Regions:
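Short beta-strand/loop motif that positions the catalytic acidic residue
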Residues: 244, 249-252
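Short beta-strand element of the alpha/beta-hydrolase
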Residues: 87-96
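Catalytic nucleophile-loop/oxyanion-hole region of alpha/beta-hydrolase
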Residues: 102-104, 109, 123-158
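N-terminal targeting or regulatory segments adjacent to alpha/beta-hydrolase or S9 domains
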Residues: 1-69
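Catalytic histidine neighborhood in serine/cysteine hydrolases
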Residues: 269-276
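Conserved alpha/beta-hydrolase "acid-adjacent" motif
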Residues: 256-263
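A short loop-to-beta-strand scaffold at the N-terminal edge of the catalytic core in hydrolase folds
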Residues: 66-82
Length: 276
């Protein structure tokens, strides 16, 4: 069954070499100064069109409709490791983009790098606004379940890590702190598998809306940070860490608010969860 996904290796190589998902900064905004979201999504859709995709819900995504014609139903692109017998594990990669667009290099380029490092990789295409952050979390959780369900068929090995950047890092942290081990009674076979990742790599994610105000300059009433105090606490990664949380690697850039990484690192330290 892996054969049909092997074409994704060459397609990914070509996409990275030709900068298929990269737009010059000058084209990121329209003349009026607003983000050119339509141009971004059209570029992503065109670049990903030839890939063999795995839809997250074969019978249709719950709650999905045609409110945004530029958004396909959520999927991931599976890219087999160069050597299946020596595979180092599986990494589910989630791009950033503020939940409004898709930062292509944080998806395709990252997947290509880790493919060449000996990993199976899967590029997640999750729902954006007007869908909610909870919808995007459900997409990543479903992708993890599928990878667990396909472990033997796709020769994935035991370990699955999530790796995200910016908004994708926020999703990775949420899925590392909100998970289950599957429902054995579910009629949907995929739902019988758990959605806990074995590790999470979080790149410059806005971790919290409660430990300190306005992460990354986002207003506290931004719905992507939660509507109401209960949602804000649920989505604040550091508030949901416990001793069963998987290990994490946290990193940020010099221009990011360092409190994001530090508040999560402190929570992991307090819970005695390994982190770097």
């Amino acid at each position: 069954m892996l054969e049909k996904y092997r074409k994704n290796i060459e397609l990914l190589k070509q996409a990275v070499e030709t900068d298929a998902v990269i737009r010059p900064i000058a084209k990121h905004r329209k003349p009026d100064g607003s983000l050119d979201i339509e141009g971004n999504l059209l570029l992503w859709n065109k670049a990903l069109e030839p890939f063999e995709k795995t839809r997250l819900w074969e019978q249709g995504t719950p709650g999905f409709d045609d409110r945004d014609p530029l958004q396909e139903e959520p999927y991931f692109v599976f890219v087999p490791a160069p050597d299946e017998e020596k595979c180092r594990g599986t990494i589910l990669v989630a791009h950033g983009g503020g939940f409004t667009w898709r930062t292509g290099t944080e998806g395709l380029n990252v997947a290509w790098y880790f493919h060449n490092a000996g990993f199976h990789t899967a590029i997640l295409c999750y729902r954006l606004v007007p869908y909610t952050r909870f919808d995007a979390i459900a997409d990543m959780q479903r992708a993890i379940r599928i990878l667990r369900a396909k472990r033997e068929e796709w020769k994935l090995g035991e370990k699955i890590a999530v790796m995200g950047f910016s908004a994708g890092g926020m999703l990775s942290g949420n899925c590392a702190t909100h998970y289950d081990f599957g429902n054995p009674q579910s009629e949907d076979e995929t739902e019988r598998f758990g959605c806990r990742p074995d590790a999470a790599v979080i790149g410059y994610g806005a971790m919290t809306a409660v430990t300190f105000p306005k992460p990354f300059g986002m207003m506290q009433d931004d719905p992507m940070m939660g509507n109401g105090i209960e949602e804000k606490f649920y989505l604040s990664i550091e508030k949901n860490v416990d001793q069963d949380t998987p290990p994490m690697f946290i990193w940020q850039t010099m221009s990011d608010d360092g409190r994001n990484g530090m508040c999560l690192a402190k929570a992991l330290q307090d819970a005695e969860v390994p982190y770097r």
